[in-house]
A protein has these predicted regions:
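Catalytic-core regions of glycoside hydrolase
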Residues: 1-103
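C-terminal functional modules
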Residues: 99-184
């Protein structure tokens, strides 16, 4: 690989088909190609989890490797509109990785993409971000806002104990919001 023409761009996807881009991974490839790699990040592409929308925050890529890359692009989902949150976020990351703010960028993307229903889109996206089990082992966090209540409720249910009313109400409220948000 190191003998390839210097004018050629070497698109690299990371150390697996889908993974976060790490310092170790980019150092490994740069040593072999003898120049900064051009990253083709396989996210939010979802052709291997077609029943999922990947609308959550973009996170996990090293924010200190800008000088080790010659470029950074995203591989979007087959759903153009649904890819916009991630495309916006990846563009922000690629523009200045050191100053990339996962949550602020995600919220900015949502407000930019659908300003008339940003709250609804945020609710829908918050609960549509994980890939689910897949052959690549790549996962994203999902429904973090209700995770503690959901875990406590599920534990009580499995143990045949009474659930906490506040947890139930939190989950019920969120599920109603999710239903309404999906219908905008």
């Amino acid at each position: 690989i190191h003998r390839t023409e210097k004018q050629m761009i070497a698109h690299i996807i990371g150390d697996r088909v889908i993974s976060d881009i790490t310092r170790d991974g980019i150092s490994w490839i740069n040593e072999r190609i003898k120049r900064p790699a051009y990253i083709w990040w396989n996210f939010p592409v979802s052709d291997y989890v077609r029943d999922h929308l990947l609308l959550g925050p973009v996170y996990g890529n090293d924010t200190t490797i800008a000088k080790e890359m010659s470029g950074f692009v995203t591989n979007p989902m087959e759903h153009a509109e649904s890819s916009k949150i991630a495309i916006y976020s990846v563009a922000s990351y690629a523009w200045n990785p050191a100053k990339y703010d996962t949550w602020q960028t995600w919220k900015d993307a949502i407000r930019t993409i659908l300003p008339s229903a940003a709250e609804e889109l945020e609710c829908f996206a918050m609960h549509n971000s994980d890939l689910g089990p897949n052959g690549h082992g790549y996962r994203r966090e999902e429904s973090m806002d209700i995770q503690p209540a959901a875990e406590r409720f599920l534990k009580a249910f499995k143990e045949g104990k009474n659930y906490d009313k506040a947890d139930f109400e939190t989950l019920q409220y969120t599920f109603e919001r999710m239903k309404e948000s999906a219908d905008i």
